[in-house]
């Protein structure tokens, strides 16, 4: 018997992410923008891989995002704006985008575009 469709999709996503992680790493000057998506929420972190620390983070679980009216895509846009603001406050203008193996579309693209519009360089 084969795997379920959801298990196959998850394994494929993890393989894509592993391939991507071989090629990119975050530095103090240019941290990695990591996106994690669930069915309900989206989380994003700026990670310095040299010392394994999180520089800044934003999530749709936060109160000001959670209270937003609209769909999950609108919340992703707000999370992208928040991470760009927090990156600027930490003195970061450029990042390496790690989409976590997710396809670039929908909520992932909305978050990335909002971060770019608010001054974050990819």
Curated annotation (Swiss-Prot):
Keywords: Ribonucleoprotein, Ribosomal protein, RNA-binding, rRNA-binding. GO terms for molecular function: 5S rRNA binding; structural constituent of ribosome. One of its GO terms (cellular component) is cytosolic large ribosomal subunit. It holds the Pfam family Ribosomal_L18p. One of its GO terms (biological process) is translation. Belongs to the universal ribosomal protein uL18 family. This is Large ribosomal subunit protein uL18. It comes from Mycobacterium avium (strain 104). The lineage of its organism: Bacteria, Bacillati, Actinomycetota, Actinomycetes, Mycobacteriales.
């Amino acid at each position: 018997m084969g795997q379920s469709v959801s298990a196959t999709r998850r394994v494929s996503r993890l393989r894509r992410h592993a391939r991507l992680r071989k090629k990119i790493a975050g530095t103090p000057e240019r941290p990695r923008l990591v996106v994690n998506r669930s069915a309900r929420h989206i989380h994003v972190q700026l990670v310095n891989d040299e010392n394994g620390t999180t520089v800044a983070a934003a999530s749709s679980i936060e109160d000001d995002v959670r209270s937003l009216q609209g769909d999950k895509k609108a919340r992703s846009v707000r999370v992208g704006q928040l991470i760009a603001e927090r990156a600027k406050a930490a003195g970061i203008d450029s990042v390496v985008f790690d989409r976590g193996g997710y396809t670039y579309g929908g909520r992932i693209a909305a978050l990335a575009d909002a971060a770019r519009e608010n001054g974050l360089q990819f």
